[in-house]
Each structure stands twice: as structure tokens, then as C-alpha cells.
């Protein structure tokens, strides 16, 4: 279809142009349950949390990430619990239809994201940490690490920092409505559409066109957009989501999501990453609100460089 953006997507590496050939693998990414309808997997409750996140539990934007297995496991478990509470409170008693998100949510999610980037780049450390997790965190962490590792293994870091333009994304609930509309109209799960935008532009935070000319929050080549964009604006989030849903539906989704995603971007690592994040949101739909707050990083030969988020 098109080529998917320059490196910054999950890892700051340019993805090659789509060939239009189908992936022989098949599979779907799950149900269409929405965050507002999901129960807490740990307790079965759908009630709002009344807890208050203590300031001492909120990490600074560049807080240290331990490399000792036991310490890292403890840190990930504690931050995961606090983040889930903070997200649940934001979704159920706050206003996820407005920008910006609560600072506590941004900071907690950022710390988790940085941990997963460390694990994705270190197979031995990841295996040791994942082996000591259980329950919902274990499943979520496996999805995040495997998706990140697939992209890390396939793409190399860049030597120089690309010139990216970034911006604030549309509010979380507004994007979610667009994804749900794409599911209603074309049958492509909202989780798949959200995972595509997550990888392509971090939910619209990347405003630049790619080096290959792909444009907008779903990174379409203009010629492909002309065929599948339904007459909309390539840079408009609503129109881009519907165009992506139309394209994926035309190439096998739902029912053969992997083949459809391979048409979207013919890189197995990309297909694996989208599928992993989509499956994670299928297991826990409220995870969408965490992924929504993932920031733009560029993976360089000198280490990660963060371009968006708290403290910048």
C-alpha cells in the first residue's frame, strides 16, 4: 500500500514501501469490546476507583530504570498497579474527551514505556523479568516486549536525529470514537486500528510526512489514499482512520488481519507488533488509554531520544 514512516514509529526507523503481496499467515486480533464496558481483570469490578495516587509514587520524566532483575520486576509491578488505578480514575471520573491527560497518567505511562524499551533491546533481561511476572501484568508485558523486540530486531538505530514535527494528539475518547466507527463500518476491530496509529505516528503526535512521502496520522502514500481515502483529508484523524479501515477491509480484514496488515506494510515485524498491541487491548480495553499516552522516541546509535511528553 505505502511505506510506513521513518524510524520514529515505535523505534525511529524507516519502514519500507508496501509490496501489495499477502502474508500467508492468518489470524484476527479479537473482539470489539470498548474500554467503558470492561471489568477489572483482577477483581471483576467495573466500579470507579476512589483511591488517590500518592505524589511519591509518580516517577519523574527521566527517572532511573534499574537493570537488576528483582528490582526491575518490583518497580514494574508497583508502577503497573498505580498506573491502572490512575487510568481508571481518569476514564471513569475525569475527562478523556479533553486534552491534556492528567499529568500522573502521562508520567506513569512514560515510565512503563521506558521500561519496555529497555526490555525490548535486551533479550536476556527481558526473559528474566518476564519469567517472574504473573497475571494480567505478565500478559501485557509479554505483548509489549515481543512487539518492541520484533521491531528492534528488524530495524537498526539511526545515526542522526531526523527532523520531525510533532504536535498534541486528538483527545483519547475522540480517537476512540473514530476507531469504533471504523469497526462499525468496515468490520476491522478498533484495537487493530488503534495499534496501527500507535505504531505509525504515536496516535497522531508525529506531524511530519515520511521520507517516502507517506502522510497523515495513518501514514498513507497519496496514490493509495486516492483509492481508499473515501474522498477525505489524508491528514485528518477521522478520515485517516476510516481510510485505513477501508484499506484493511479490502485486503482481508476481518478474518485475515495478518494478511491485511502485511498489505498495509509488508514487514513481518510490523505485522507482529500491530497484532501484539491489538491483542493486548482486546484482553484489557482500558489499556488503550495507556497506549494513547506513549510518547515519541527516536532510537539512535547513541541511545533513545524522546521528542514528546512531560518535561519537554
Per-segment meaning from a language model:
Residues 107, 111, 195-198, 243, ...:
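Amphipathic alpha-helical interaction segments
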Residues 202-205:
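Periplasmic/extracellular electron-transfer cofactor-ligation site
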Residues 207-210, 274-275:
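Short, solvent-exposed loop/turn and secondary-structure capping segments
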Residues 97, 164, 209-210, 229, ...:
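Residue-level detector of alpha-helix boundaries and kinks
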Residues 1-184, 268, 276-312:
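Cell-wall glycan-active module
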Residues 170-185, 191, 217, 222-278:
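Alpha-helical segment that forms one wall of the substrate-binding/catalytic cleft
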Residues 124-128, 187-195, 208, 253-264, ...:
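Surface-exposed patches in mature extracellular/periplasmic domains of secreted proteins
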Amino acid at each position: 500500500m505505502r511505506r510506513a514512516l521513518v524510524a520514529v514509529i515505535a523505534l525511529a526507523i524507516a519502514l519500507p514501501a508496501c509490496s501489495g503481496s499477502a502474508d500467508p499467515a492468518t489470524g484476527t486480533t479479537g473482539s470489539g469490546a470498548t474500554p467503558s464496558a470492561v471489568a477489572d481483570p483482577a477483581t471483576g469490578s467495573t466500579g470507579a476507583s476512589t483511591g488517590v495516587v500518592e505524589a511519591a509514587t509518580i516517577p519523574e520524566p527521566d527517572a532511573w530504570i534499574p537493570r537488576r532483575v528483582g528490582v526491575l520486576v518490583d518497580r514494574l509491578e508497583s508502577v503497573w498497579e498505580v498506573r491502572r488505578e490512575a487510568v481508571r480514575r481518569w476514564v471513569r471520573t475525569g475527562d478523556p474527551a479533553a486534552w491534556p491527560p492528567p499529568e500522573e497518567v502521562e508520567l506513569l505511562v512514560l515510565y512503563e514505556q521506558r521500561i519496555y524499551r529497555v526490555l525490548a533491546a535486551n533479550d536476556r533481561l527481558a526473559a528474566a523479568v518476564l519469567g517472574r511476572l504473573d497475571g494480567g501484568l505478565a500478559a501485557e508485558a509479554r505483548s509489549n516486549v515481543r512487539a518492541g523486540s520484533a521491531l528492534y530486531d528488524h530495524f537498526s538505530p539511526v545515526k542522526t536525529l531526523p527532523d520531525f514535527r510533532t504536535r498534541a494528539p486528538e483527545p483519547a475518547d475522540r480517537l476512540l470514537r473514530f476507531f469504533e466507527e471504523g469497526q462499525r463500518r468496515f468490520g476491522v476491530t478498533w484495537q487493530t486500528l488503534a495499534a496501527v496509529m500507535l505504531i505509525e505516528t504515536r496516535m497522531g503526535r508525529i506531524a511530519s510526512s515520511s521520507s517516502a512521502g507517506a502522510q497523515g496520522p495513518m501514514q498513507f502514500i497519496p496514490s493509495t489514499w486516492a483509492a481508499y481515502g473515501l474522498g477525505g483529508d489524508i491528514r485528518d484523524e477521522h478520515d485517516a482512520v476510516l481510510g485505513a479501515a477501508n484499506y484493511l477491509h479490502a485486503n482481508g480484514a476481518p478474518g485475515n488481519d495478518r494478511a491485511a496488515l502485511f498489505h498495509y506494510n509488508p514487514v513481518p515485524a510490523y505485522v507482529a507488533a500491530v497484532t501484539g498491541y491489538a491483542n493486548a487491548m482486546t484482553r484489557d480495553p482500558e489499556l488503550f488509554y495507556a497506549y494513547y499516552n506513549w510518547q515519541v522516541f527516536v532510537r539512535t546509535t547513541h541511545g533513545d531520544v524522546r521528542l514528546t511528553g512531560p518535561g519537554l
